Amino acid sequence: MRRLVPNLIWIACGTAAVVGLGVVALKRGESISAAWVLTAAVCSYLVAFRFYSKIIAAKVFALDATRRTPSERLNDGRDYCPTNRWIVFGHHFAAIAGPGPLVGPTLAAQFGYLPGAIWIIVGVALGGAVQDFVILASSVRRNGKTLGQMAKEEIGTVAGYTALVAVLGIMIVLIAVLALVVVNALGESPWGIVTVGLTIPIALLMGAYMRWFRPEKVLEATAIGIVLLIVALYAGRWVAEHPVYGPMFTLQRTTLAWAIMIYGFAASVLPVWLLLAPRDYLSAFVKIGVVIALALGIVIVLPPLHMPAVTQFVDGSGPVFAGKVFPFAFITIACGAISGFHALISSGTTPKILQREPDARFIGYGGMLMESLVATLALIAACALTPGEYFAINAPAAALGTTVESAAEAIRNWGFTLDPAQFNALTQQVGEQRLLSRTGGAPSLAVGMATIFSNAFSGSGALALWYHFAIMFEALFILTTLDAGTRVGRFMLQDLLKHAWAPLGRISWYPAVVITSAMFVAMWGYFLYQGVTDPLGGINSLWPLFGIANQLLASVALCVGTTVIIKMGKARFAWLTLVPLAWLVSVTMTAGYQKIFSPEPRLGFLSHARIFTDALAEGRIPAGAASADAARQIIFNDRLDAAVAAFFMLAVIVILAASAREWWTILSGRKAAVSTEVPYEPALAAAMLRADSLGTVVATEPARRTRRLAPRALFGAIGSAVHVIIGAPDWRRYANAIRSMPRRLDAGGAEVLATPTEFAAERLAARYSKPGSRCC
């Protein structure tokens, strides 16, 4: 009977997912409620996490709570540091949830809501979440090694070096694009600059609070951070409206670009517990809070999806971007379903701070499901706009003209309608001077979110407030990915440079950390500055490569994941990664080939460059270029795009071929499967500690934790306050401290717990020693 109720709940959840997907896929001829898409997504995520992720956790990796993690084994207080699972989840989610799940589904809405909804829901359960989980678990078992290191050790030297160079190049492109999006979102916006900027000192305060003043008091630090964040939101609005401070914090895009470079460098060299983890944890509260509020708003408003299920633009004639629904819907959505960038975070910062192995399931698989929910909500917000409003905001001026009237005529020719008067009124209501041809996805998403929020919570009078809040939310969403990405890029650069000079690869040598951080920031910072100062060159020309590079990186990660599973002797489970790998390779290679060689100038890099070259040869300036020099710059950029795309594709082909060869030699018995996992070591926190009334240490297994009753929790809080006031030894703080600190050795060399007397003497002495001492 005890199992009957849970089973019935899961059956109902699965049924709701199937019904929701059926309605989304089969209903035609009229708009459907967004509730169907939301129901299908949420129920599918719950079923996938409960059953599909459990196969990976139990059958493939057999995650063990008693196994020591890299954060304990290599604890250095900077990069390796045992961290509370909720803070790790917050950091991980904040790091992976960048512009992809917001902008990608918004742009892909030009195909209709159906292709995007199906791919986001199915793709994440079978592909994206699997990749993140497998790479995270693999890295944890290998002392937190990066994706490039694992490729070298698991697949081979050639594939490893190819992966290191290719992944580093892809990372430079990805981080520069992320930084450019932040600059465009915050440029000349004092509200956003002040609010986002204040999250940095707030994070420093939280990090110091949990490190020195109240270790492991996560809830207290969280409450302080949330209160200060609310203050920061209102402070940003106050500064923006102030006649003196408003212009003072209205920064130019070039100034903001330098500021972002400085921040990226600081986030890479400072200890992870001081800035990166608490700031991402704080940002995760904003992200998750807004996501929950948006989902709640959709449930309250139940907006109809005005965009058709499938539009005529599936043939590749779309005005927002060129390309057919296959493969470009999957390339454009990117992070909403699967993202190669996540593999860098899952093998970068996250495995180095994970405290318990079983948390990898919740953080790796669950974190990706949460990001997919963000993509679903972004798709709903975009499709809740009328098609006329959507295309008026997202289509370029070349397709719409420069006036609302010309845009209405162009949209009418596409089979949709736009009322110029209503569109002008919408522009005024959101507090913008212009919404027409605000391409990129972010403005239209902000309009959709603001409309849902205002209808659900405040009324149309606060539309401008909600719009600017959404813009700030998008900028905050992206910036957290930039700082974690910079740190991961530093790890990768150290992996590469250690072959030239070994000390540069030592993460424990601080000069190497500073040097490689400065080098990596200079790499993406150069392209960022070029993109900010020259709209025709720099990173702007590399934007079309963002989706392709990201998905090719996911292919590399799945190759590594498949190899790890086979070498573990679990080849019967290799289909978990082989299925998404096969699909992803077919999609990305098709998209890359079309972007390079397509004869359609709107799609192919080389054909577009040829049009401009022929025009210059005839002595005329081609359409779309302001001068002959600008035309030459566009030609260079197109050819650079083609060369970079070809290099990335070739690198992935090399890695895929090397992986297939490794799989064949192992499965055919020609080569023994040698695992590179770190041998099992018992975790320092394998046995939870508690103290009885006399202070005697009692070991209890983790699985036998008991819930505190309310009175006991109250007495515990009072006791903690007394400890702080009178300075008495705090046994719980000691128990938390020894999870990451070596215990003393007895005469035989075995680790033993300190006695209560030793503990009290040490704890009292620590009160008068420097901050950061053991048990402090």
Regions found by a protein language model. Give the residues of each.
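Extracellular loop-to-transmembrane helix junctions
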Residues: 30-50, 108-138, 148, 191-203, ...
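Flexible loop linkers connecting adjacent transmembrane helices
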Residues: 53-81, 107, 121, 130-159, ...
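Loop-to-transmembrane helix boundary motifs in multi-pass membrane proteins
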Residues: 154-172, 366-373, 439-441, 459-470, ...
